[in-house]
From Swiss-Prot:
This is ATPase inhibitor, mitochondrial. The keyword Chaperone does not apply. Exhibits variability in chain length, mitochondria have distinct pools of protein cleaved after the 24th, 25th, and 26th amino acid. GO terms for biological process: angiogenesis; erythrocyte differentiation; generation of precursor metabolites and energy; heme biosynthetic process; mitochondrial depolarization; negative regulation of endothelial cell proliferation; negative regulation of hydrolase activity; negative regulation of mitochondrial ATP synthesis coupled proton transport. Residues 63-106 form a coiled coil. It comes from Homo sapiens (Human). Keywords: Coiled coil, Mitochondrion, Phosphoprotein, Transit peptide. GO terms for molecular function: angiostatin binding; ATPase binding; ATPase inhibitor activity; calmodulin binding; enzyme binding; enzyme inhibitor activity; identical protein binding; mitochondrial proton-transporting ATP synthase complex binding. Residues 26-52 are annotated as: N-terminal inhibitory region. InterPro entries: ATPase_inhibitor_mt. It is found in: Mitochondrion. The gene is ATP5IF1.
């Protein structure tokens, strides 16, 4: 029976420690909510400047890619609309020819 009580105390002790650790980690995280990925930049120094330069380079590259994609999209739209204009002009000519043929038959 003494062994069982000792085992129970040990088991509860381990879980008690685990519970306290979990609570401790949880409170640490909630206290540091305002700190985030930008903490290196906020610290300043060489690492902060490097991080800022890398972020700016990344966003400039993203902007270039977006502008290139937008330009390509607009160029494709222009080509599509030109083809549509040509198709409609051919259809107009075809209808004019039909009208001409109908007038000729009268």
């Amino acid at each position: 029976m003494a062994v069982t009580a000792l085992a129970a105390r040990t088991w509860l002790g381990v879980w008690g420690v685990r519970t306290m650790q979990a609570r401790g980690f949880g409170s640490d995280q909630s206290e540091n909510v305002d700190r985030g990925a930008g903490s290196i930049r906020e610290a300043g120094g060489a690492f902060g400047k490097r991080e800022q330069a890398e972020e700016e380079r990344y966003f400039r590259a993203q902007s270039r890619e977006q502008l290139a994609a937008l330009k390509k999209h607009h160029e494709e739209e222009i080509v599509h609309h030109k083809k549509e204009i040509e198709r409609l002009q051919k259809e107009i000519e075809r209808h004019k020819q039909k009208i001409k043929m109908l007038k000729h038959d009268d």
